[in-house]
Amino acid sequence: MGDTGTLVLLRHGESDWNARNLFTGWVDVGLTEKGRAEAVRSGELLAEQDLLPDVLYTSLLRRAITTAHLALDSADRLWIPVRRSWRLNERHYGALQGLDKAETKARYGEEQFMAWRRSYDTPPPLIEKGSEFSQDADPRYANIDGGPLTECLADVVARFLPYFTDVIVGDLRAGKTVLIVAHGNSLRALVKHLDHMSDEDIVGLNIPTGIPLRYDLDERLQPVVPGGTYLDPEAAAAGAAAVASQGAAKA
């Protein structure tokens, strides 16, 4: 491992709205039973491969917090320091939050749907303050005036990377194994940075739920293996394909 620590990225287990194929964003939904099982299994994988975290970073959303708790429990690491920040939250999907992905695709067309869902710099329409799935009155975001009203991936990069550089990198430089339990788009933002992916290439990156992704970093914090290594590669490939297919109408 050398003087630089190891970074482990973990997307939360399947959420209730993942299962229902809804845009979630900052809406605070829980895990399905499948998602809880994924979280437990992720901790088992960490223990089996002797990749035990020294510190955990996660978001302010329960699907990530619960995943982190279950993973640490199954890896017998509940005692490690836990640091939470809104900067690790999922991308805010604006007015799309709560909408069915397949219905949204059918209504607006493939091109607009994919631009909102996967492009680097196209945000969805703004969510209306005070609406059902808005966070403007949520006390956890009082210090940031309720948070954003929409975001594209570039916005997530802008809010997450300074936190990574100013806070998380310090633990990596200290030789710690750092576990980040977050969300599909906040992790895509970080992977884009780590792997120097272009704005075009990041469009095709899909991160599966509940499978740890290991990055060994050199002294310059560059990945030893570009793209990292999933602890369960077969499950990761299947999970990424499932994420890519979201938006398809269910039979």
From Swiss-Prot:
Its EC number is 5.4.2.11. The record marks 183 as: Transition state stabilizer. It comes from the Bacteria. Keywords: Gluconeogenesis, Glycolysis, Isomerase. The active site is at 12 (tele-phosphohistidine intermediate), 90 (proton donor/acceptor). CDD domains: HP_PGM_like (cd07067). It catalyses: (2R)-2-phosphoglycerate = (2R)-3-phosphoglycerate. Coiled coil: none annotated. It holds the Pfam family His_Phos_1. The keyword Isomerase applies. GO terms for molecular function: phosphoglycerate mutase activity. PROSITE patterns: PG_MUTASE. Substrate binds at residues 11-18, 24-25, 63, 90-93, 101, 117-118, 184-185. Pathway: Carbohydrate degradation; glycolysis; pyruvate from D-glyceraldehyde 3-phosphate: step 3/5. InterPro entries: His_Pase_superF_clade-1, His_PPase_superfam, PG/BPGM_mutase_AS, Phosphogly_mut1. GO terms for biological process: gluconeogenesis; glycolytic process. Belongs to the phosphoglycerate mutase family. BPG-dependent PGAM subfamily. Catalyzes the interconversion of 2-phosphoglycerate and 3-phosphoglycerate. PANTHER family: PHOSPHOGLYCERATE MUTASE. This is 2,3-bisphosphoglycerate-dependent phosphoglycerate mutase.
